[in-house]
């Protein structure tokens, strides 16, 4: 019996067969190309401005990406290359060969295991930064290793390492999930967002466009790009030029930059705007996660309300549903049309919302957690601060349903029940503890 068979929630509990090829898509239908190009130009200028004015980090002021200083010279040799090739080798006929960046992150772990379980080849890359406790990432790494996924420890800004990986493996696809996450932390460490979400993405695109053959790329954008948009539900064709946080701005910049590389170099690119992903093995900086921790410890939790005293609401999306969307995007991605940095024809460019399309007030989230934990929360109601958070999110998933076969199936209470079961096992040593 597999060590994953008794999981409270695992990639693989749902059907992960490949989505049939979509064919020729009208993939420019919702995109305003001129605005994307403008955003790409603006944020490339922002990045250059950052590079020029930023002083070199001193030993006492290292950012979260310390691991980016690790040279690719650390890697190589026959044993290392054997591990890389073995992990990336598909086990099924016609299987994909996928480089997953941010593989030991929340979404990256689930996607990597789902791909591996259906027979695809998967190679992980992660820098194990300290944005949250690296021990959680190391534990996820253990799951990946037991599933046959080798994770290279390195940074997406390390061009030498990336080129080495592309030399060793002919990747058919890249699932780019590495990023500096979190809305509020951007106010404390803005440089890390520019470094990872813009510079790191550009570095990956540079290496990918020079590859022969070029891989198709699916990358994580964010629902945060909708910013101050008040039209609901949020649709891919809605305006995204009013970001409410630096995190959102870097994600929007990524979309513009991706379009530029698609247009100039023929890279096949698909962006996925995730809406508040939650579930087992999640991120400790997310509300559902630290609410659970603080309720169990008897600490007061802060619940924000909108300026009109209404409840802040989120389109909470369970991790298994997000994984389905990621696999659907990979399976329907057309091949890139360039080779060795030269475009040979138009290439696919797509943007999709991946949400649950059922916004839930945060107050209801707390009520569900109280029920599952059998403890009453000590709540402090506060006005929503102007630190980048928005009052609500609501995804229109019509496009993803039609073109990716995306159908979210897990409601918030069911998903939180699975999360709490995992949390109690992982952090409290519950007898119901599972390998997930």
From Swiss-Prot:
Which EC main class describes this enzyme?
isomerase
GO cellular component assignments: endosome; Golgi apparatus; Golgi cisterna membrane; Golgi medial cisterna; trans-Golgi network
The residues that hold NAD(+) are: 97-128
List keywords of the entry alphabetically: Carbohydrate metabolism, Golgi apparatus, Isomerase, Membrane, NAD, Transmembrane, Transmembrane helix
The GO terms this record gives for MF are: UDP-glucuronate 4-epimerase activity
- Mode of membrane association: Multi-pass membrane protein
The record's section on Pfam families has: Epimerase
Would the keyword NAD be found if you checked this record's keyword annotation? yes
Give the UniProt tissue specificity note. In leaves, pollen and siliques, but not in roots or flowers.
Q: Which reaction does it catalyse?
A: UDP-alpha-D-glucuronate = UDP-alpha-D-galacturonate
Q: Does the keyword Nucleus apply?
A: no
Q: Which family does it belong to?
A: Belongs to the NAD(P)-dependent epimerase/dehydratase family.
Quote the function comment for this protein. Involved in the synthesis of the negatively charged monosaccharide that forms the backbone of pectic cell wall components.
Record protein name field: UDP-glucuronate 4-epimerase 5
Corresponding gene?
GAE5
């Amino acid at each position: 019996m597999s060590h994953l068979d008794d999981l409270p929630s695992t990639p693989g509990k749902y059907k992960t067969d490949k989505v049939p090829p979509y064919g020729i898509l009208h993939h420019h239908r919702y995109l305003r190309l001129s605005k994307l190009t403008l955003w790409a130009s603006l944020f490339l200028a922002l990045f250059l401005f950052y590079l020029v004015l930023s002083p070199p980090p001193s030993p006492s002021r290292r950012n979260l990406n310390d691991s980016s200083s690790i040279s690719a010279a650390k890697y190589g040799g026959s044993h290392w290359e054997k591990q890389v090739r073995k992990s990336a080798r598909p086990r099924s006929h016609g299987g994909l060969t996928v480089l997953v960046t941010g593989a030991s992150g929340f979404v990256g772990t689930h996607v990597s295991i789902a791909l591996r379980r259906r027979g695809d080849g998967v190679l992980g890359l992660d820098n194990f930064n300290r944005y949250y406790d690296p021990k959680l990432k190391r534990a996820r790494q253990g799951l990946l290793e037991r599933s046959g996924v080798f994770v290279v420890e390195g940074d997406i800004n390390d061009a030498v390492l990336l080129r080495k990986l592309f030399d060793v493996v002919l990747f058919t696809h890249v699932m780019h999930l590495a990023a500096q996450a979190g809305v509020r932390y951007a106010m404390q460490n803005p440089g890390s967002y520019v470094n990872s979400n813009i510079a790191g993405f550009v570095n990956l695109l540079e290496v990918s466009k020079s590859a022969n053959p070029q891989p198709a790329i699916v990358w994580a954008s964010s629902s945060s790009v909708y910013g101050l948009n008040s039209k609901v539900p949020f649709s891919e064709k809605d305006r995204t030029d009013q970001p409410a946080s630096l995190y959102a701005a870097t994600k929007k910049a990524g979309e513009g930059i991706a379009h530029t590389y698609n247009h100039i170099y023929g890279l096949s690119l698909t962006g996925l705007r995730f809406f508040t992903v939650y579930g087992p093995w999640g991120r400790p900086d997310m509300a559902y996660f630290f609410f659970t921790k603080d309720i169990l410890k008897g600490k007061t939790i802060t619940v924000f309300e909108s300026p009109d005293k209404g409840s802040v609401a989120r389109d909470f999306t369970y991790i298994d549903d997000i994984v389905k969307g990621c696999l659907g995007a990979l399976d329907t991605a057309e091949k890139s049309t360039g080779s060795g940095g030269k475009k040979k024809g138009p290439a696919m460019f797509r943007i999709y919302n991946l949400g649950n399309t059922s916004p839930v007030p945060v107050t209801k989230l707390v009520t569900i957690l109280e029920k599952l934990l059998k403890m009453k929360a000590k709540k402090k109601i506060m006005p929503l601060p102007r630190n980048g958070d928005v009052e609500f999110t609501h995804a229109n998933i019509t496009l993803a349903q039609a073109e990716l076969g995306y159908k979210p199936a897990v409601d918030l209470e069911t998903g939180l029940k699975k999360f709490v079961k995992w949390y109690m096992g992982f952090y409290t040593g519950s007898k119901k503890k599972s390998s997930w």
